[in-house]
Structure formats: C-alpha cells, structure tokens
From Swiss-Prot:
Belongs to the class II aldolase/RraA-like family. The keyword DNA repair does not apply. Homotrimer. InterPro entries: RraA (IPR010203), RraA/RraA-like (IPR005493), RraA/RraA-like_sf (IPR036704). Divalent metal cation. A divalent metal cation binds at D103. It is an enzyme of class 4 (lyase). This is Putative 4-hydroxy-4-methyl-2-oxoglutarate aldolase. Keywords: Lyase, Metal-binding. Its EC number is 4.1.3.17, 4.1.1.112. Its cofactor is a divalent metal cation. It catalyses: 4-hydroxy-4-methyl-2-oxoglutarate = 2 pyruvate; oxaloacetate + H(+) = pyruvate + CO2. PANTHER family: 4-HYDROXY-4-METHYL-2-OXOGLUTARATE ALDOLASE 3-RELATED (PTHR33254:SF4).
Length: 165
C-alpha cells in the first residue's frame, strides 16, 4: 500500500476533529528504501536500550509497523543496519522511532520504511529494560497497539482503525 497522507486527511476531516485520526509532529527524517508504508502498530517504550527492539523484530512482523517511543533521546541509536535487515526478513513494513537510528547507508537499502528523529553513531545499552504493546506518546500523537499507521513523504498519520479512502 502506498499511503497518501494528504488525501487521507482531506477525506477524514471529521476523524481529525474528533481525534480518531491524529498527525504526528513533522520532526521525523526518512530512511529505508520505502518512502511510503502502512500497517497496524506494534508498540515499544524504551530508553537508550534496544534489547526489546531486537527481540520484537525477531518475531514475525505480519505487515505491521513497529512504533518505538525512545523518549526522544538523541544520545544513542535504537535501530541500526542489522535490525533493519531483520525487520525486512521478518515481514515488518516499517519502523517509526522517537529517537535515533544509525548505519544509515545500510538502512537505506533495506526494503522497509523508517522514520526517526536523527542519525547517531553510538549504539544503545543492552539492559533488557522496556515495555511492549503499551500506549506510547510520540511527537504530536498517542499510539496504541493495533492503531493504523500511514506514512509517506508528507507525514505520519495514526488512526484508531484502518481507514478506507
């Protein structure tokens, strides 16, 4: 699916007004080979520790988008080239990170879409700390497990359920 976030916003102004469709703040940079992607959200809440990110990406993605609330940390990366390849191999369509990624050249050849705040060369800690399948606060929007994520070059949308055009 190739989302067109502008068309979805225009077609669902009522949902924007009632809050069942939300727009993330325009603070994310694009990485990965896919400029547009969509799917149901799997969520993680971590801080400078990507142990749970790896464990989640090792599981079947089944067309989902991994939404990682990394607390907006700009001090280390939560996703790198190896995890990008793992996500692609296991059927994840995309990753949205409220934090940093690294190995951008490697990620840019992965056949998934990735959005993150920035690139950072330092890897994260590995303490096995974090929460999965919880409600997370991303820049500008709350994301709950199972919400639908729509991403393209114009932005990131979060819908309570799958949108029809």
């Amino acid at each position: 699916m190739k989302p067109v976030t502008t068309d979805l916003c225009d077609a669902h102004e009522d949902r924007l007004a009632e809050g069942t469709l939300r727009v993330m703040a325009p603070v994310f940079r694009a990485f990965g080979k896919q400029p547009a992607f969509a799917g149901p959200a799997a969520t993680l809440k971590v801080f400078e520790d990507n142990s749970l990110v790896r464990a989640t990406l090792e599981s079947p993605g089944r067309g989902r988008v991994l939404v990682i609330d990394g607390g907006g940390s700009l001090r280390c990366a939560l996703v790198g080239g190896n995890l990008g390849l793992l996500a692609e191999k296991n059927g994840w369509v995309g990753i949205v990170v409220n934090g940093c990624i690294r190995d951008t050249a490697e990620l840019d050849v992965c056949d998934i879409g990735i959005r993150a705040l920035a690139a950072h060369p330092q890897k994260s800690q590995k303490r096995n700390v974090g929460e999965s399948e919880v409600t997370v606060q991303m820049p500008g929007a709350v994301v709950r497990p199972g919400n639908w994520i729509y991403v393209d070059v114009d932005g990131i949308l979060v819908a309570d359920d799958k949108l029809e055009r």
